[in-house]
């Protein structure tokens, strides 16, 4: 009987030692490292399963080679590093420098920006611009449902593809998990290049359950772009039941579209392994646009070397003098963001947070 105990002990050590070494080498915050070690120590088998699905530090993964990422980011944006008559307000310069230095997110002047908070207005504008496309349409969305609205947008894309316009579509595999394959296959048969982002067979049991593409980007001919929180689904227009859907989306015309194009083409390389960097996708900006709206598009991802957007929030909160108003459908902040919010509030800055009701995460203390 004693031999069985020794066997169990050896098995436990054989599992625990590599598991703990893996956690220690994962280069995470000390508190998180200790928490995972305790979970593994007291629940070794269950703890390993939890760690595989939820604990791995994906920021260290290189899903795109450094050379390809360099060509898609730095080289595609290099000519925009120096822009004539670019005036950045002094109080915004530190923040914009932060994004430029760590994300190659260059600010662009003279943009026309329209804000949509109504789904009808957004879809009408999107369909209109799709109808005006002459060279290419690049659409990147988390949800593209096969409902009445989804078919309306799909038909518009198919019409343009049949006219010879290049149409590229990326949808998230988890976001569109319930959408029938025939919906996207119909678009492929019409000549649209369609790819799903990180396909998974069982979304609820994948280690990349939160490793999804939530971007909602559309770039048309490199001259007009859309970005925001609205997916392609009927509920974003008609709401759900008696409740109206409230979200925000932007239409950008001007140099800021170059940044949206870059974000899409990075995602496209990831799903298609095709390096699209031809300058025809970055056409000259219409000289008639003189709105004087400064645009800087910042992207972030689990594989980026820096948590760009999180650092931006911290910087915004700590440099604010009067107020910071935040609106989000999900509020699960990191400790640095919470610390910055508390610090700013204690310094007398008016911090306001707008979230939907009801919420399922009432454990946060601000």
Put a short name on every predicted segment.
Residues 1-311, 315, 319, 343, ...:
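N-terminal localization/anchoring segments of enzymes in phospholipid and broader phosphate metabolism
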Residues 362-366:
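Conserved small/polar residues in nucleotide/adenosyl-binding loops
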Residues 311, 315-318, 322, 335, ...:
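Feature representing long, continuous alpha-helical segments
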Residues 300, 326-328:
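Thr-Gly-centered strand-to-loop micro-motif
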Residues 330-349, 361:
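Helical hairpin unit composed of two closely spaced alpha helices linked by a short loop
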